[in-house]
């Protein structure tokens, strides 16, 4: 009996000695086998894992979604589904605008700025601002061209707002839709390394139109040479952005098909800019005061009455 007591006393003494020598050691309570091991405060072994838990969150489902790289998406008929397309901050919008104004050769706008997070906030407000910039600048240009003419009566043309809205929004949505369908069709025949979603294409087209906002404001200057220089600069910047963005998506295709696709994209973009300049600025409608001319019968009647 004494030998057993001595053995138990020696184990307790060894444990106490070990804890004294290494206070950070892991201890387990024998009376509660279901309890998990406890670490002493200040243990460096668990600090890294705790920091990861703080970054990823304590919810296991959130960790699984983050590790899988996927988020739960709401049904398309709910408000939350469309809210994700406007989930961008001011820095992201300004960064994408800056990227559209300064396209870098060899850099992909989608991979560099959008990064699989396309938004509709920027394209929507860029198109809305461009609509009013074109309509208001067109009316002011018409007014300045005929300023000082006694026979000219200025009448604001509010219908230019609706016409500009139809043109801009149709271009910003229908052209990307057609391009997306074409790229999907070609990808079924030729496997391309780079592929874009419909929202990514809409996002690229929306931000590519930002350069036309200051251009439309400067179109107020009643000089055709200045206007055409401005439109060529804007077309060169935005057109190069579109060409450099969509060339990787068709590069693996047939050479003629790839070149024809890029040329078509640039030509449609040119048609938009030149068409807006020609319709809203270069062809102002004349609205003179009505003038009356005396007919021979009226002259004879006036002479008889006198």
UniProtKB/Swiss-Prot annotation:
Ranges annotated as spanning the membrane: 120-140, 163-183, 201-221, 228-248, 257-277
Sequence similarity: Belongs to the YIP1 family.
UniProt topological domain (Lumenal) ranges: 141-162, 222-227, 278-306
Listed Pfam families: Yip1
One cellular component (GO) term of this entry: plasma membrane
Signal peptide: none
Topological domains, Cytoplasmic: 1-119, 184-200, 249-256
GO molecular-function term, one example from the UniProt record: small GTPase binding
UniProt keyword annotations, A-Z: Endosome, Glycoprotein, Golgi apparatus, Membrane, Transmembrane, Transmembrane helix
Name of this chain's protein: Protein YIPF1
InterPro entries: Yip1_dom, Yip5/YIPF1/YIPF2
Gene from which the chain derives: YIPF1
Biased composition (Acidic residues): 50-59
Biological processes, Gene Ontology terms: vesicle-mediated transport
């Amino acid at each position: 009996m004494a030998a057993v007591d001595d053995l138990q006393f020696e184990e307790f003494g060894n444990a106490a000695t070990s804890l004294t020598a290494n206070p950070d050691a892991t201890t387990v309570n024998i009376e509660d086998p279901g309890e998990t091991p406890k670490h002493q405060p200040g243990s460096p072994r668990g600090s890294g894992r705790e920091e990861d838990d703080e970054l990823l969150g304590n919810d296991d489902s959130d960790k699984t979604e983050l590790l899988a790289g996927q988020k739960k998406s709401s049904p398309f008929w709910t408000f939350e589904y469309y809210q994700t397309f406007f989930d961008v901050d001011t820095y992201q919008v300004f960064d994408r605008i800056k990227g559209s104004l300064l396209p870098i050769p060899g850099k992909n706008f989608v991979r560099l700025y959008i990064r699989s997070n396309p938004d509709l906030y920027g394209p929507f407000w860029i198109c809305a601002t461009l609509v009013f910039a074109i309509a208001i600048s067109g009316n002011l240009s018409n007014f300045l061209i005929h300023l000082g003419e006694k026979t000219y009566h200025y009448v604001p043309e509010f219908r230019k707002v609706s016409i500009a809205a139809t043109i801009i929004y149709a271009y910003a949505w229908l052209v990307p839709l057609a391009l997306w369908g074409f790229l999907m069709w070609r990808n079924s025949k030729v496997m391309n390394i780079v592929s874009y979603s419909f929202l990514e294409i809409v996002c690229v087209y929306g931000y590519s139109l930002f350069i036309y906002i200051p251009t439309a404001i400067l179109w107020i200057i009643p000089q055709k040479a200045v206007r055409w220089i401005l439109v060529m600069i804007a077309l060169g910047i935005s057109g190069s952005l579109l060409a450099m963005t969509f060339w990787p998506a068709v590069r693996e295709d047939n050479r003629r098909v790839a070149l024809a696709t890029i040329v078509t994209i640039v030509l449609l973009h040119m048609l938009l800019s030149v068409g807006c300049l020609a319709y809203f600025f270069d062809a102002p409608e004349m609205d003179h005061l009505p003038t009356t001319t005396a007919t021979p019968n009226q002259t004879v009647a006036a002479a008889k009455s006198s």
